[in-house]
Structures are given as structure tokens and as C-alpha cells.
């Protein structure tokens, strides 16, 4: 498919995000490259940014999980810690940076519940982990969005090279998926609609602070739906 053709791109009016068309058909899923067939769908080209999430909050008055609890988890001193005052506006906590200089970075410190609330407001939904992986991997079973080459600092944000998130699209087009989706390895873990166990929700993609092995497209993480980390964000999908 021509990933750059107008027929394969669409601006969703509610939140103004560009979406990418993923055609129906089989792809190779998971570590064992199982053949899975999915119907066609649309998915956001990039993760939701701080600017876009702020627009949602301004329109609805929404208060995030971390703002309610007063705590978010951050990797600010070389280890994971619960930080008072860490939330989407201050990912590392007060005094450790805010989003004013990161308008085009992916929003983080959002729970699965927060991501779902945004998606519902936008008239979309979270992708399943199979939908997420197909959009990231294409149909040929590659290890990374760009192919099978090991990740480098020119292809994605990982292993604390940048010390925080980077603007969406920084590694485009060289790091893009076959369908033209951006930032699907590294930068942030992305919430999906998929459940694991009684209460866990699946995240995919690998975050900015994680080693290279975690940005392989088959890797998954599972968090409780109310957990908030400075590596966790999301993108949305919708049915045709």
C-alpha cells in the first residue's frame, strides 16, 4: 500500500489528529509469528501529545488519576519512585520540569482510565494489542517498525539517551512503521484496550528509559488501570 496516499490518511475532526488506515487482512503476531486476521481500522499516526491532552482537559474539566491521588511514578534518580505532585502537567514532579516546553511531546503520567476518557471524548477508543502490533509491525513479522536492524539513537528514544520523552515525530520517517505510524518503538509505553488477568491492562512499545530489548515490538507490559508512570501514554484507534 502507498502509506502516503490521501486515501490512507484522515484528520479526525474532534481532536484534529491525523489517523492512518490499516487494511483488513493477516499479519504475523507475537513472538511465534502467529497468523492473525483483523478487519480494517484507523489508528492515530502519533501518540496523543501534551497539547492535545490539554485541549481535552480544557473542554471537559477532566481531572486525571495522578492529580486526584497526588502521586505519579517517575524514574528521576535512576530508580522508580512514587513522586508527590507528579502528574501529566509535571511528569517528574514539581520542580522537575513541566509541559510548557514539551507541548509536542507525548502526554505521560496518564492512567488507562485517563486514556480511555480521552478516547471516549474524541469519539474513538484505545486499540487492542493486536491492532497496535499490526500498525507497528506491518504484515511481515519484523522486529521493529523500521525492520530488523537493532535500535540506534537515530531510530528511536530508548535507554535514557535523551533523559526524557522526545517530540512526536523526531525519528520520522526513518523510524516509522510500514503503515507510516510514528514512535511505536521507544519514547513511551502505550496503553491498549486489552486486558491481562483480572485487572491488568496491556501496554506496548517500550519507554524512553528502557534498554533496547524492551523496544522490540513483541514485548508487552501489564499495569493496573489506575497506575501512572512518566513513561506511559497512548494513541487512539477507531473502527471504519
Predicted regions: what they are:
Residues 41, 54-65, 122-123:
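Short capping motifs at secondary-structure boundaries
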Residues 230-240:
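Short, structured beta-strand segments at or near domain termini in extracellular proteins/domains
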Residues 49:
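Acidic, metal-coordinating catalytic segment for phosphate/diphosphate chemistry
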Residues 6-21:
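GGW-centered surface loops in extracellular recognition modules
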Residues 6-10, 31-33, 220-225:
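Short, P/G- and charge-enriched loop/turn segments at secondary-structure junctions
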Residues 22, 28, 63, 68-230:
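Functional-site microenvironments in short loops/helix caps that host divalent-cation chemistry
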Residues 35-40:
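A short N-terminal beta-strand-loop micro-motif at the entrance of redox/enzyme domains
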Amino acid at each position: 500500500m502507498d502509506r502516503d496516499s490521501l486515501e490512507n490518511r484522515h484528520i479526525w475532526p474532534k481532536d484534529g489528529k491525523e489517523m492512518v488506515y490499516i487494511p483488513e487482512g493477516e499479519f504475523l503476531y507475537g513472538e511465534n509469528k502467529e497468523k492473525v486476521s483483523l478487519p480494517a481500522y484507523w489508528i492515530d499516526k502519533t501518540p496523543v501529545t501534551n497539547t492535545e491532552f490539554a485541549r481535552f482537559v480544557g473542554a471537559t474539566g477532566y481531572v486525571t488519576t495522578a492529580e486526584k491521588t497526588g502521586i505519579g511514578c517517575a524514574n528521576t534518580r535512576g530508580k522508580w519512585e512514587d513522586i508527590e505532585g507528579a502528574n501529566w502537567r509535571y511528569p517528574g514532579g514539581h520542580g522537575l520540569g513541566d509541559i510548557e516546553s514539551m507541548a509536542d511531546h507525548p502526554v505521560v503520567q496518564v492512567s488507562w482510565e485517563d486514556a480511555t476518557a480521552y478516547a471516549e471524548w474524541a469519539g474513538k477508543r484505545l486499540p487492542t494489542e493486536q491492532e497496535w502490533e499490526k500498525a507497528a509491525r506491518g504484515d511481515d513479522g519484523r522486529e521493529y517498525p523500521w525492520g530488523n536492524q537493532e535500535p540506534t539513537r537515530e531510530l528511536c528514544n530508548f535507554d535514557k539517551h535523551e533523559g526524557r520523552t522526545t517530540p512526536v515525530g523526531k525519528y520520522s520517517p526513518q523510524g516509522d512503521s510500514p503503515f507510516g505510524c510514528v514512535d511505536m518503538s521507544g519514547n513511551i509505553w502505550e496503553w491498549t484496550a486489552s486486558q491481562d488477568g483480572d485487572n491488568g491492562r496491556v501496554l506496548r512499545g517500550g519507554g524512553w528509559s528502557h534498554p533496547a530489548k524492551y523496544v522490540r515490538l513483541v514485548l508487552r507490559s501489564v499495569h493496573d488501570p489506575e497506575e501512572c508512570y512518566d513513561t506511559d501514554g497512548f494513541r487512539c484507534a477507531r473502527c471504519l
